Amino acid sequence: MAKVEQVLSLEPQHELKFRGPFTDVVTTNLKLGNPTDRNVCFKVKTTAPRRYCVRPNSGIIDAGASINVSVMLQPFDYDPNEKSKHKFMVQSMFAPTDTSDMEAVWKEAKPEDLMDSKLRCVFELPAENDKPHDVEINKIISTTASKTETPIVSKSLSSSLDDTEVKKVMEECKRLQGEVQRLREENKQFKEEDGLRMRKTVQSNSPISALAPTGKEEGLSTRLLALVVLFFIVGVIIGKIAL
């Protein structure tokens, strides 16, 4: 038995073209027209359902009306040497009187009432002459970004060289110098006192007393070392600001 000819008009008729790059969703449109005087049910199928999203994928087209179907290709790693084997099929039939349950309508449809059209998928990459245009766009974006960043850098440099900040750092440096000098004098005084205690300790032969001065001296040395390190860091900061 001869197959019933498709009554719907398809635009495009034979190929669905998807233009890359394919790093994002690529959409192409399929227009279905119903030139008849009867309502027509349609359904869109594909051999690769996981790779495409079709909206709407089924429905009813009124007599003399048309509908646009969006076919969305999901992102994937494109290989130019690999030919696409994906295909789509538009299946249709004249709508019965009762269309309240479309699932049952399609399930009960007779093979001789079904009409179908097949389309193959074609993947295209941007033409070579489009690439310089993309390069120019990238240059414009880069230039704009550079101009945007320049005031930020200048503002940062201006803030670093603020006279008030430099004055505060210098005052802190002087304060640290005075603190270091004071600790040196205290350290000298402790050493003199420790020498006196050591002599008394030797005379009394007390091991506990001999350990006491050492703990004080170590505590003082630690404080002195910490201040020296802090003073060094402040000096480095001043040096960078001066440059």
UniProtKB/Swiss-Prot annotation:
The secretion signal range is none
GO CC annotations on file: cytoplasm; endoplasmic reticulum; endoplasmic reticulum membrane; glutamatergic synapse; Golgi apparatus; plasma membrane; postsynapse; presynapse
Q: Does the keyword Coiled coil apply?
A: yes
In the UniProt annotation, what is the result of changing K43L? Does not affect interaction with the conventional FFAT motif of OSBPL1A. Impairs the interactions of the MSP domain with the phosphorylated FFAT motif of STARD3
Q: Which residues form a coiled coil?
A: 159-196
Residues of the MSP domain = 7-124
Please tell me which positions the record assigns to the cross-link Glycyl lysine isopeptide (Lys-Gly) (interchain with G-Cter in SUMO1): K147
* Subcellular location(s) per record: Endoplasmic reticulum membrane
User: What topology does the record note for this protein and the membrane?
Assistant: Single-pass type IV membrane protein
Where do transmembrane segments lie in this chain? 223-243
Predominant place of localization: endoplasmic reticulum
What is the tissue localization of expression for this protein? Ubiquitous. Isoform 1 predominates.
Q: Which GO terms describe its molecular function?
A: beta-tubulin binding; cadherin binding; enzyme binding; FFAT motif binding; microtubule binding; protein heterodimerization activity; protein homodimerization activity; protein-membrane adaptor activity
Phosphothreonine: residues carrying this PTM: T150
Quick one: a GO biological-process term for this protein? positive regulation of viral genome replication
Give the family this protein belongs to, as stated in its UniProt record: Belongs to the VAMP-associated protein (VAP) (TC 9.B.17) family.
Instruction: Describe, as the record does, how this protein assembles with itself and its partners.
Output: Homodimer, and heterodimer with VAPA. Interacts with VAMP1 and VAMP2. Interacts (via MSP domain) with ZFYVE27. Interacts with RMDN3. Interacts with KIF5A in a ZFYVE27-dependent manner. Interacts (via MSP domain) with STARD3 (via phospho-FFAT motif). Interacts with STARD3NL (via FFAT motif). Interacts with CERT1. Interacts with PLEKHA3 and SACM1L to form a ternary complex. Interacts with VPS13A (via FFAT motif).
According to the entry, the disease involved is:
Amyotrophic lateral sclerosis 8: A neurodegenerative disorder affecting upper motor neurons in the brain and lower motor neurons in the brain stem and spinal cord, resulting in fatal paralysis. Sensory abnormalities are absent. The pathologic hallmarks of the disease include pallor of the corticospinal tract due to loss of motor neurons, presence of ubiquitin-positive inclusions within surviving motor neurons, and deposition of pathologic aggregates. The etiology of amyotrophic lateral sclerosis is likely to be multifactorial, involving both genetic and environmental factors. Spinal muscular atrophy, proximal, adult, autosomal dominant: A form of spinal muscular atrophy, a neuromuscular disorder characterized by degeneration of the anterior horn cells of the spinal cord, leading to symmetrical muscle weakness and atrophy. SMAPAD is characterized by proximal muscle weakness that begins in the lower limbs and then progresses to upper limbs, onset in late adulthood (after third decade) and a benign course. Most of the patients remain ambulatory 10 to 40 years after clinical onset.
Query: What name is this protein filed under?
Result: Vesicle-associated membrane protein-associated protein B/C
Identify the species of origin: Homo sapiens (Human)
Q: What is the lineage of its organism?
A: Eukaryota, Metazoa, Chordata, Craniata, Vertebrata
Gene designation per UniProt? VAPB
